[in-house]
Amino acid sequence: MRALLVSVALLLPVPLPAQDAIRVVPVAGAAIAAGARFDIRVEATGPPGGDAPAGLTVVLDGRDITATNILAPGPGGEKGSGGAGTPDGYQPARDRAAAAPPHTTNFLRRDVALDTPGRHTLTATTAGGATATVTWDVFDWRASAPAAAPRAGNVILLLGDGLGLAARTAARALARGYTHGKADGRLAMDTMEATGLVMTSALNAFVTDSAPGMSSYVTGHKAANNMEGVYPDNTWPPRAPGQTATPVDGLALFDNPRTEYLGALLRRTRGPRFAVGLVTTADVTDATPAANAVHTSNRGAASGIASRYLDERDLNGLAVLMGGGRCHFVPRSGEAGACGRADGRDLLGEFQRAGFTAVGSRTELRALGTGGAAPPALLGLFHPSHMTVAFDKVGAGSYSDDLAADARRDLRDQPMLEEMTSAALATLSAHAPDGFYLMVEGASIDKQEHSVDAERAIWDVIEFDRAVAVALAFAARTNTDADPDNDTLVIATADHETGGLGLIGVGNPRYAPQSLGYAVRDYAAVFRFEPDQAALELFPNYERDARGFPVDPDPSRKLLVGWAAAPDYYENWLANRHPVAPATNAARVQVDGRAVTVPMPAAANPLRDGPQDTAVNGGRRVPGLLVAGIIENGATGCPARECPPDTDTAADAHSISGHTASDVPLSASGPGAASFTGTYDNTEVFARILRLAGRR
């Protein structure tokens, strides 16, 4: 028996030392514009608790660049070993990098530029035998072209956050109407010269979020969800014991390997009189605007994002910034519940001292248009957080009560998106002789789709389209004058689709909830009819004002919307006079005699169209029917030791709808618009813009 045991033991596999792992960014296959700046980071990782890999060597195109590592020496004197960050006091401060885990050895080089088009190869090795090789494709965008070739002096990119094809169709139906099966008019987006389809996936997920969705358009590089203008690295700040919230401040959130933004690249190559403008209906530190100027691994790091708009303006070229988010620009007061910056910095005052004209209301913004020349730089902060949506601004006092409360009196004087767009164009066209890049976001299309609120989402699409019309009118003037250097390229697109919005039918008045007093599924008339029902007319019958907004969101034949990526929710087919969450994931319970809010699986919110809804329609409640959701709701549960946070997405109950991976439409007008036909990746949009805007 002893001999047998020995023989068996000899046959058992002998554990081998854990192999070092190497990660390189930019990732293999990245397409990089010739001369565009980017950072290279190489991370060699040993076993947790073990020694850091030794002898990290980095070779680019056959040339050893290991010595260019900006990280401090670690144990043994090797740069970047033991997780060392940049040396204390490293300058410039924006290039500093935080420490990484001690079982890693890292390489970091900032602001690399590859001028020669073609394939470039980087190989990293360690003394332990680990190796990684990546190849990048560098494309030429500065090649000479015939004098008649299209070129864009200005670029206006309008992004409807979450704006899928169905939402465009819905806005057309409500804003223009249909007669005898044909649309009575077109949206501004419909009139653009070329349309294509964009694939939207992020670096690490089939379904993107807004941060990489935007930054892919303007860097040409993929980014991971929640990140903007950067690649992932291993310096993410660890959570303190018992900490559940994601860190929102600190060097590690702003030290990731960067990729140069379109506006910064054009400013660097065109000259310092090239300017950048960012306009949004969201908080200006939100993912989409920030993903045009600020590099961070956490889209939620609002205070630091706001600071970098100003502190890095010589690089980002920012001359116009408008939207909500005033709380991130003023110091926090001592009043309970008051918003403001924890660091006490008066960023609003600093912007003004830097030459920005600051406005805080629609009245003040309109006054700029009557006071002579447009200001050279413009900061508009019209809300403490995200701006009020179009449905509640247009419908105030009619079909919306959102702004009726005295507590919201100060929010009644907010501009519409098209007004902000006009003001931005006035400043940029007057003070940016080297051209400009303007991003305009219809932000709350997405936010209201997350809330499974069809009316508020569609109203925001109509508002967004009115901003598109302003951009097209501006381009029509510049593209027909005698100056070929001020021609304007206009693009209208989305970062992703939200909610899986589908147009399921039109309400059959026979089963209208207003008539029955409750909602039924039979109200949703579908496409199948009998031969003797040809006289039925089931098209939406909205009346609309001069701007295209319906005057009543609940006509007898309203457009009905369904959702493929929603939580559980109640549906009564009627517009909500107040914005109310579709589902909840918390409950108030008694613990030791105290009322405590505890996390729960997401469930339909009975306060919106459900059994506890106190809203009225025509003086009475109209209870809705329960619609079962399909996305993760946190009901399964998983012990933390079995589901670490970096692997489990269902730990947080999702009480809103999710994004989807559907391709999104992109429409273009102006010089080179035809190059945007077809189906292409979001990173390819960057290259197509650059080839047009880089020709001067």
Where do the PLM segments sit?
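Edge beta-strands of extracellular beta-sandwich domains
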Residues: 130-139
